Regions:
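Sec-dependent signal peptide cleavage junction
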Residues: 20-37
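Solvent-exposed serine/threonine-rich low-complexity stretches and specific carbohydrate-binding patches
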Residues: 78, 89-104
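Short, solvent-exposed, Trp/other aromatic-anchored flexible loops in extracytoplasmic proteins
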Residues: 97-125
Length: 146
């Protein structure tokens, strides 16, 4: 008999607790909800990076990026970096960065071959930028030569 009474009280208490947990979800302002929806609606979906050796003195960097939503442009910028043993950090190598820009596209594939020294340690720094509805999103990623 005690078991039935405790179930009779426990079930309404659990339902009440569930209802209390959902109240804060409805308390968000419509403005913050609209901003969150916009940021979620237009975002970088996929960024794939490879940096592979090609012979002894070349490295091939390949980047694929895609974004969803209302995309005005997508841009990839690749910067070669080399390890500086005196500072223990990677620094930008002498020479330019290489970029590709695609207006009104939601994806972009870009590849570039870098000249390398056999006696240095390299990686690439990749900046991927997408823009839409006046909001710009940039991700910076790194890939070591492998």
């Amino acid at each position: 008999m005690k078991m039935k009474k405790s179930k009779f009280i426990l079930v309404p208490l659990l339902l009440f607790a569930l209802i209390l947990n959902t109240i804060p979800a409805f308390a968000a302002s419509s403005e913050s909800a609209a901003v969150a929806q916009d940021a979620e609606g237009r975002k970088l979906n996929t960024v794939t990076i490879t940096f592979k050796p090609s012979g002894l003195t070349k490295g091939v960097a390949t980047v694929y990026a895609s974004a969803s939503g209302n995309v005005e442009y997508i841009k990839i910028k690749i910067t070669l970096q080399e390890y500086d043993s005196s500072s223990g950090k990677y620094v930008n190598s002498p020479g330019p960065s290489y970029s590709s820009y695609a207006p009104n596209k939601s994806s972009l594939y870009y590849t570039h071959t870098f000249d390398l020294s056999a006696f240095k340690t390299y990686r690439i720094k990749v900046d991927v930028t997408s823009s839409g509805d006046g909001v710009t999103q940039t991700e910076t990623l790194y890939q070591s030569l492998s």
